[in-house]
């Protein structure tokens, strides 16, 4: 009776393990890259959905300046501490009467406060405003892989009547064109 493996049998097993490891080493990074792309695409979809959820609410609550400050996660900090637009916080304290160039910060802040991370680099936020509104994830050219940007494409109006377009831009894969969604915004509605 034989009580072990021959050298040839052991070499065959080692060769099979080596082949499987080589195949796994080439397949696994592709699977991980695909998962990261899906996370960025999902974040893009969530940003679009979140902004859409705030559309049209101004007509229902026009003049209720604190609505966003009390209902939008992360908005309180944006509204009470950041006044880069030159106004005082009480002048611009809600979705209905906020310039789009500040509103994009408020929307991005919602995702920052809720822990959105860049799947390609988890030390960076996953959603940001082009005007560099939150944390240190500030890119002047707004094209960093894994980040979804809430940019302001156009803005008009004043007082309680700001309107224009947001451009949601997500860079999900090196060398690929970004996902872009242009969203009209009209506080007059």
Feature roles, as predicted:
Residues 2-29:
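N-terminal single-pass transmembrane signal-anchor helix
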Residues 3-4, 43, 47, 125, ...:
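Intrinsic disorder/low-complexity segments enriched in polar/small residues
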Residues 33-63:
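Membrane-proximal N-terminal amphipathic helix
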Residues 56-189:
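Periplasmic/extracellular, small/polar-rich flexible segments of pilin-like filament-forming proteins
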């Amino acid at each position: 009776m034989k009580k072990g493996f021959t050298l040839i049998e052991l070499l065959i097993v080692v060769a099979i393990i080596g082949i499987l490891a080589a195949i796994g080493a080439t397949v696994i990074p592709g699977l991980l890259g695909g998962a990261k792309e899906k996370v960025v695409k999902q974040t893009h979809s969530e940003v679009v959905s979140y902004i859409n959820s705030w559309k049209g609410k101004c007509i229902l609550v026009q003049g209720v300046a604190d609505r966003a400050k009390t209902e939008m996660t992360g908005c309180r900090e944006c509204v009470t501490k950041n006044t880069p637009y030159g106004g005082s916080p009480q002048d611009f304290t809600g979705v209905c009467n906020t310039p789009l160039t500040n509103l994009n910060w408020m929307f991005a802040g919602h995702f920052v406060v809720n822990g959105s991370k860049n799947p390609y680099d988890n030390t960076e936020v996953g959603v940001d405003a082009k005007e560099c509104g939150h944390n240190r994830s500030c890119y002047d050219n707004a094209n960093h892989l894994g980040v979804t940007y809430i940019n302001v494409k156009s803005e008009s109006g004043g007082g309680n009547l700001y309107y224009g377009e947001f451009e949601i831009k997500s860079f999900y894969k090196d060398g690929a064109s970004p996902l872009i969604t242009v969203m009209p915004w009209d506080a007059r509605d």
